[in-house]
Regions:
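Catalytic Walker B motif of ABC-type/P-loop ATPase nucleotide-binding domains
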Residues: 158-161
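Conserved ABC transporter NBD signature motif
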Residues: 60-68, 75-76
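Conserved ABC ATPase "signature" region
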Residues: 100, 104, 111-129
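Short, charged/small-residue-rich alpha-helical element at the C-terminal edge
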Residues: 228-299, 303
């Protein structure tokens, strides 16, 4: 049975009159990809800052690998590698200089640093610009170094705050290939915030925040079943035939779409009208639809 590597219980944090985190409780299993979703201001960054020891909580408990962060902050911090949304690299320094100075804080120097650097160069493919100043790197190159910096000390948990925002598709895919490899080879836990719902759809568990509280949680499959309808697309039939089903429908290119509560209802409809459903597909709603149904907002923050 998988153990909980992060456990947050009844966490609260306010800024003056604003309740940023409101009685928040959730768990993250060791080795899983955990997605933490919410619009800007929902409480994600505050929670992450408390988890990383950068911000004091008002009340509640935060445990990393069974250890309370209040009681052994230095020990729990070493278990975490963090990639912040805004890069914390020193732009005038080269990539190697940035990583060397960071590694020294963990006591990784000399041959140990050289060995770890070479491992990260191979994993993240940055040998070509190892000696280039960070200020001269592209956004995608800089993001790779942000991740390398977070991985220097072999953390058990990698926290990724919007890791692929603004990156080209090729770099996004490279980063996710690395993350998936680390999960498989090192059983690394990944704590993700993202605006890309296709990334959240691959998570083992999802928590959706709204105004500092959990609005919904579960696996992507559970959330899609609970909050959004399936859609049946049917092709090659006339409008009179679609009307004969006595259901609401929408005209689309080359056919029609019908919303159903779930796959069971879709199957029943198709079996009962096999003569009409000779060319069709059943599609579950996506995580974008889940987020909109739960919060009334798009992840970009629009109502």
């Amino acid at each position: 049975m998988e153990s909980d590597i992060i456990k947050i219980s009844h966490l609260n944090k306010s800024f003056s009159e604003v309740k940023a985190v409101n009685d928040l409780s959730f768990r993250v299993k060791k080795g899983e990809l955990f997605a933490f979703l919410g619009v800007n201001g929902a409480g994600k960054s505050t929670t992450i800052s408390i988890l990383c020891g950068l911000l004091k909580k008002d009340s509640g408990t935060v445990q990393v690998n069974g250890i309370e962060t209040d009681k052994a902050g230095a020990q729990t911090k070493r278990m975490l590698g963090v990639v912040f949304q805004d890069s914390v690299l020193d732009k005038p320094l080269t990539v190697k200089e940035n990583l060397k100075s960071r590694a020294a804080l963990y006591g990784i120097t000399g041959n140990a640093f050289d060995k770890r650097l070479q491992e990260l160069v191979e994993i993240l493919d940055f040998d070509e610009f190892l000696n280039r100043p960070v200020g001269k790197l592209s956004g995608g190159q800089r993001r790779r170094i942000d991740i390398a910096r977070a991985l220097l000390h072999r953390p058990e948990i990698l926290i990724l705050d919007e890791p692929t925002t603004g990156l080209d598709p090729q770099t996004r895919q490279l980063i996710w290939n690395v993350i998936e490899k680390l999960q498989k080879t090192e059983n690394m836990t990944v704590f993700l915030t993202t605006h890309y719902m296709e990334e959240a759809a691959n998570a083992g568990y999802v928590v959706i925040l709204d105004k500092g509280s959990i609005a919904a949680e579960g696996t992507p499959f559970e959330l899609k079943n609970d909050y959004v309808q399936d859609i049946v697309f049917v092709y090659g039939i006339s409008e009179d035939e679609i009307k004969s089903l006595n259901r609401e429908y929408k005209k689309i290119r080359d056919g029609y779409q019908i919303k159903v509560r779930n796959t069971k209802e879709a199957t029943k409809l198709i079996v009962e009208h096999q003569d009409l459903f000779t060319d069709y597909e059943v599609v579950k709603g996506g995580m974008d639809d889940v987020f909109l149904a739960v919060t009334g907002k798009k992840l970009g923050g629009e109502r």
